[in-house]
Amino acid sequence: MNVLSCSINTLIKEGLYEISGVEVGQHFYWQIGGFQVHAQVLITSWVVIAILLGSAVLAIRNPQTIPTDGQNFFEFVLEFIRDVSKTQIGEEYGPWVPFIGTLFLFIFVSNWSGALLPWKIIQLPQGELAAPTNDINTTVALALLTSAAYFYAGLSKKGLGYFSKYIQPTPILLPINILEDFTKPLSLSFRLFGNILADELVVVVLVSLVPLVVPIPVMFLGLFTSGIQALIFATLAAAYIGESMEGHH
């Protein structure tokens, strides 16, 4: 009994020691000019982009009148993105389908790559490879693109009259309305970053403590929540664009 107890204690201590070695925020940098660039984020982002471009090429390489399974799948994805865009933006959704679709697919594949691709087997001098959306720089960049998109949508539809929304329904709300436009990208970026980072950390901790069986359901749950996060981001982006074009909150 004492031997069993000692073995369990040893396993727990070893697991905790491994967990203590898990570090968040370690980065491998490239020096480009006078700037430091997060190399691992670029590497994983390029892999995700290559997957998306490769899939698109395969989908449109030989289109059939009677769709094949692969063509059916991509047509279903396109219809889904069009429905999301139309629901949130309205009748003028057409020009925004490529943007919303790109956001959704990039985030979806990025999130899933963190669970399905063996990034950890590639050793870097510092830090490690992970899903692109595991890095706050990626999620902030996506959120800023969304902000630029809804400002462009509003200005292209209404011109400078777009800014009159900041004093509606009363000028007293001017500071709050301005603050709202700053909190939108913040909420988008931190929600996505926090969920993906937390999911990967939970899996790392469980694998360190219990290498078999137990982490598997958590990984499946992570895949599900990763897909939901991509949908939430794309839906909110479309809603913000529609809101800026309609001019109501």
Swiss-Prot record:
Gene3D superfamilies: ATP synthase, F0 complex, subunit A. The chain crosses the membrane at residues 40-60, 97-117, 136-156, 201-221, 222-242. GO terms for cellular component: chloroplast thylakoid membrane; plasma membrane; proton-transporting ATP synthase complex. One of its GO terms (molecular function) is proton-transporting ATP synthase activity, rotational mechanism. PROSITE patterns: ATPASE_A (PS00449). The keyword Methyltransferase does not apply. It comes from the Eukaryota. Its main location: plastid. It is found in: Plastid, Chloroplast thylakoid membrane. It holds the Pfam family ATP-synt_A. Keywords: ATP synthesis, CF(0), Chloroplast, Hydrogen ion transport, Ion transport, Membrane, Plastid, Thylakoid, Transmembrane, Transmembrane helix, Transport. InterPro entries: ATP_syn_F0_a_bact/chloroplast, ATP_synth_F0_asu, ATP_synth_F0_asu_AS, F0_ATP_A_sf. It is a multi-pass membrane protein. NCBIfam families: ATP_synt_6_or_A. HAMAP family: ATP_synth_a_bact. Belongs to the ATPase A chain family. PANTHER family: ATP SYNTHASE SUBUNIT A, CHLOROPLASTIC. Key component of the proton channel; it plays a direct role in the translocation of protons across the membrane. F-type ATPases have 2 components, CF(1) - the catalytic core - and CF(0) - the membrane proton channel. CF(1) has five subunits: alpha(3), beta(3), gamma(1), delta(1), epsilon(1). CF(0) has four main subunits: a, b, b' and c. This is ATP synthase subunit a, chloroplastic. It comes from Capsella bursa-pastoris (Shepherd's purse).
